[in-house]
Amino acid sequence: MIDFLEGEFFKRTEKTQSLMYEKGLDAILLCTEAEIRYYTGFRSLFWQSPTRPWYVIIPKNGKPIAIIPEIGRELMERTWLDEVITWPSPRREDDGISLLVEALKKSKTIGLLMGEEATLRMPLGDFYILESRITGSFVDCSQLVKEVRLVKSEAEIEVIKQICNVADCAFDRADKLFHVGQPLNEAFRDFKIALLEEGAEEVPYLVGGAGQDGYSDVISPPSRQTLKTGDILMLDTGSTLKGYFCDFDRNWAIGKASDAAKLAYSKLFKSTEIALQEIRPGMTCEQVFLMINKSLGDSCSDIGRMGHGLGIQLTEYPSLMLSDQTVLVENMIITIEPSLAYGDGLMMVHEENICIRDGKPELLTKRAAEELPVLI
């Protein structure tokens, strides 16, 4: 089941513990799926059930400690961890809290994710009980964990390359998948099937839009509206392999493309090309945002950001936006995602996935066509 060699998880933990030492942390408490998977290799769709809480403690030294429901024991014991503590869950009177208290009894300063994009995946009432029963105190460790996850290993990069290639192959089948008269929900279904046939393990994210000359919404579930000549169809997928995401989209014109749609597509292609040529380590996310924004001119949309981190989550820290001063470093993986508004309430988006390297970034996706493709 383990997706990486043990050394991968050891390095992640070792780097985290080094930063913990610098920050004076005795332990870190994790309770969210992405972080627990990142440090342990525990991957399961059972997280779709909100009933049971799951915990992992990263101590100052040694391997992480799992404190989890009994139902997850066998899978967790296949990971690199040595200590897996379980209880019969759900158990309303004590759903793992006493075990956490015991495990944290010697820790004075305990890190907990409290910052942007963080959630507390345990009952708030149980957290208050835990807080009252331990001698230590909780402090925010969000930035510490983000700093570790920000830079990908070559093993992680290789998996993301593979899932990008899977999606590329599915997108390349567009001329055989989409046609005039096809209900949009069937187009989505057929594309999802293509992704699975090409090798995706899961397709947890597939959104898009379609409409005459363009679309006005890119996050709704597909309706039964049929594709018509002159429609612009966009599909955006976050498919996964070994729990790692790709995240990019492609646009097509159905039958024919209007001048407005072709111009919008051309602007986005050129804007993305500027980013692909100019991005370098040492630039800040804000600088990249401003570069893309400037290239789009007055056509820029108000979505708020022009890309984001990518990895074991569909969207990760950081964001290519104003005020994000995160510095790009080698082996970060980010999306380049310019968008623009045009016509009467229409929009268009364009997305590629890249890895920051010494010099020009490495393009992980197959570059979109230079001109808006027309499906006949």
Place the predicted regions along the sequence by residue.
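Active-site neighborhoods and metal-handling regions in enzymes and metal-associated proteins
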Residues: 1-376
